[in-house]
A protein has these predicted regions:
Chain B
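Bacterial N-terminal signal peptides that target proteins for export
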Residues: 1-11
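C-terminal segment of classical bacterial N-terminal signal peptides
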Residues: 17-25
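Extracytoplasmic small-molecule ligand-binding "clamshell" domains
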Residues: 29, 35-105, 287, 293-297, ...
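Sec-exported extracytoplasmic/periplasmic mature domains
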Residues: 35-36, 72-77, 97-101, 138, ...
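Bilobed "Venus flytrap"/periplasmic-binding protein-like clamshell domains
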Residues: 41-50, 60-75, 109, 129-185
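Extended ligand-binding regions for polar small-molecule ligands
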Residues: 65-69, 73-75, 137-141, 145, ...
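Acidic, polar ligand-binding/catalytic clefts
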Residues: 69, 73, 77, 81-146, ...
Length: 383, 344
């Protein structure tokens, strides 16, 4: 026994096993205590309720959901809405944040200072207030009968933005196939240019020509196949529009509000990252006669990314967690379905909260894993 | 060990754990607990005009608060020995089972699954409500059966969501739900046209309609799509305390039937003519003691808040801003559902 403790490596394993046992015992004690108490109080426990009929409907479900479906499916509907909002906000907050962050370091003092104050104001208003402001703005759009229309295909009202629904005809598969082929070809051209650069040092621009090849080819094919997408425009019938895709004002509000809110966080990270790159790098590049845009793209940003990416993971995870505020304006995400209606209808508070905790935890870990890969990609490659 | 439990409850932040962790082993009678503590913890709604709402001088007012007063008077002979604990729809049952409150007075519908599954017992009805629809007059809708395809605003954490789904399924109609927090947000959504119609308890819709600057542009449809008996709940297997809750309510109802009011209760107690009055007010027999209460319990409760009819009229009746008629809440002999079993 003592022998184990003397060997450092074995001791480490021993410590970890001991720790695991203690933690498991603790968790076992807690759950046993909980179950015993619930049984004594006559409260039914377990997750079997998930397979029962939910008996309520959810607005803005991404998959078919009806009140005869199960609570489990209601959870999935909420989960998908959470994922949708998280994805949209991450994409738009990142793009907006990068633009703002770069502008924040512009040599023009008017630009720098005005952006600085905008960031400070946005950052210091709580996210819930952002959401409520954008939601009430959305409600001030015209009512559905007087909705604002663009060529009778897109309608904007306070009940949502109605877009025409694309119907793919068989020719579309040909177009898609060609698109993928062109994408592969463009990728191949880029690799070849990179190889040329490594071997001979000759720079060959491919971005513009590749863009032209991909989009030009696809559009030609689309015309050749005889416009294989037909658009089904929404039409007003009864109380509401029928057909088409609807972006509900709740999704619209949370998307815009949180994109703006988190873009200020991203902008600050970008600024911090770029400022962390030593001034000598700029000076060395310009001494070699490299243009400002190339310096940024090839010298500064790759080094800044090493500083930006790790805290960016935090921002993305915060975005995920903050989408739960959608419940305040009636966006049907996980907190509203599982933590709201399902919890109330079944009274299974602990099970519902646990389910939410696990779901948020898993998505958070997935975000962390993806960001970890990106981080490895941008990190200093040690040779 | 207690310390570990405390840390745990902080971590999980599930109230259920907290309460039970600390007091699990002893399950004394709630009546004894309340008496020992010296005051009652009354779980009421957070803000519902006429039922539980902070009024002038920051004093809580409403039908639910009056019931707390009656209960406090019945147990202690003093109408102030209670603490108002506002609970939300989401936490109300957890608060009750974890002993944060002694009785749940907040308007809570008595349903089968709640009674069977949640470790609580139903004690008595307090208010008969229904569920209806509030809609703009200009849409020209006269019946809920014309609502096919409508967008409906529903408050979260209530039975309304299920009732609407059931109703639309029964009549094979479709609707789009928008779940928005009850209160000004919902009214705003209806006014601006985010939804065509609001659904809620009829009593709540009547008071909501009054909140618009132009109440005449809105109408509460005649349809009642659900029975909503708002009831008083206690913890399961707590018979004596449940009896106290049930019979305090019954005493207030019986008082109306016997013509006893807040004003004349003293008179009746001194010179009871009707033997039923004498038994109720403690002039004859030892009826209070059977429940472990003072013999004057009913007298004290009635002199604190009046009889059931008085409580109704004072808080939500036609003279108030709520403007509700008694309707189903009339006494049984007037064709309503309010009924007290005999005091014998």
């Amino acid at each position: 026994m003592l022998m184990i403790l003397r060997d450092e490596r074995k001791r480490a394993i021993f410590d970890q096993v001991l720790f695991l046992v203690i933690v498991s015992a603790f968790i076992y004690y807690l759950s046993a205590n909980l179950i015993e108490n619930l049984n004594r109080l006559g409260i039914s426990t377990g997750f079997s309720f998930l397979w029962q009929e939910a008996g309520y409907q959810i607005g803005g479900a991404l998959i078919d959901f009806d009140d005869t479906d199960s609570y489990a499916l209601a959870h999935i509907v909420g989960l998908l809405n959470t994922l949708l909002a998280t994805f949209l906000i991450i994409v738009s907050a990142s793009i907006l944040g990068f633009i703002i962050g770069i502008l924040r370091m512009s040599p023009n003092p008017l630009m720098t200072n005005s952006i600085r104050y905008v960031i400070e104001v946005i950052r210091n208003i709580p996210s819930l207030v952002h959401i409520v402001i954008w939601f009430s703005l959305a409600l001030h759009l015209p009512p559905v009968r007087q909705s604002f229309d663009i060529y009778n295909t897109v309608f904007i009202s306070n009940r949502g933005i109605y877009l025409p629904d694309p119907n793919f005809e068989s020719g579309m598969w040909g177009v898609l196939f060609l698109f993928i082929c062109l994408l592969a070809y463009a990728f191949f051209r880029k690799r070849k240019a990179q190889q040329l650069m490594r071997e001979t040092g000759k720079y060959q621009a491919t971005f513009l020509s590749n863009t032209l090849i991909i989009w030009g080819g696809t559009i030609c094919a689309y015309l050749l196949f005889g416009l294989p997408i037909t658009w089904q425009a929404p039409t007003l019938s009864g109380f509401d529009f029928d057909g088409g895709i609807t972006i509900a004002p709740e999704l619209f509000a949370i998307w815009i509000a949180l994109s703006i809110y988190f873009s200020s966080h991203v902008a600050e990270l970008v600024r911090g990252g770029v400022q962390s790159v030593s001034k000598g790098q700029f000076e060395a590049a310009s001494a070699l006669g490299v243009r400002y845009s190339i310096t940024m793209k090839m010298v500064v940003i790759p080094q800044a990314m090493r500083v930006i990416v790790p805290p960016l993971t935090n921002v993305y995870q915060n975005i995920l967690k903050t989408t739960s505020l959608g419940v305040a304006i009636g966006y049907a995400e996980m907190t509203a379905t599982t933590g709201g209606t399902t919890l109330n209808l079944t009274g299974q508070a602990i099970e519902c909260i646990l389910l939410m905790m696990v779901s948020y935890g898993i998505i958070s870990l997935i975000i962390a894993a993806i960001m970890d890969q990106i981080n490895k990609h941008v990190a200093i490659v040690e040779r | 060990m207690i310390k570990i439990k405390t840390i745990l409850s902080a971590i999980t932040s599930v109230t259920l754990l907290t309460g039970m962790g600390a007091t699990a082993p002893v399950f004394a009678d709630t009546l004894d607990d309340v008496k020992k503590r010296g005051f009652l913890r009354c779980g009421t709604g957070e803000a519902k005009a006429g039922f539980a709402m902070p009024g002038d001088n920051n004093q809580w007012q409403g039908m639910e608060i009056d019931y707390c007063k009656a209960l406090s008077s019945a147990v202690f002979g003093d109408e102030t020995k209670f603490e108002v604990v506002p609970v939300t729809s989401k936490v109300r049952f957890t608060s009750l089972t974890s002993r944060e409150i002694d009785v749940l007075v907040k308007g809570t519908t008595w349903t089968y699954s709640r009674d069977a599954k949640l470790g609580v017992d139903f004690a008595a009805y307090w208010f008969f409500d229904g569920q209806g629809f509030l809609i703009k007059k200009e849409l020209g809708v006269t019946s809920a059966k014309q609502l096919n395809g409508a967008t409906i605003c529903i408050s979260p954490g209530t039975t309304s969501e299920k009732n609407v789904a059931d109703f639309f399924r029964t009549y094979d109609m479709k609707y789009k739900p928008v779940v928005i927090k009850a209160g000004p947000e919902t009214l705003d959504a209806l006014q601006k046209g985010r939804c065509d119609v609001i659904t809620n308890d009829l009593s709540a819709l009547a008071s909501d309609r009054q909140k618009f600057t132009n109440p005449d542009d809105f109408v509460v449809l005649q349809d009642n799509i659900a029975k909503e008996p708002l009831s008083l709940y206690v913890r399961q297997n707590d018979s004596r305390w449940k009896d106290v809750i049930t019979w305090t309510r019954n005493a207030l109802v019986e008082a109306e039937e016997l013509g006893i009011t807040q004003e004349n209760v003293g008179q009746h107690a001194k010179h009871p003519i009707d033997p039923r009055v004498a038994r109720l007010l403690g002039a004859k027999g030892a009826y209070g003691e059977m429940l472990g209460l003072p013999n004057t319990w009913a007298h004290d409760a009635i002199s604190a808040v009046g009889n059931y009819g008085e409580i109704f009229e004072r808080n939500v009746g036609e003279q108030t801003r709520m403007g509700l008629t008694r309707n189903l809440n009339q006494q049984w002999y007037d064709g309503g559902l309010v009924f007290a079993p005999p005091f014998r």
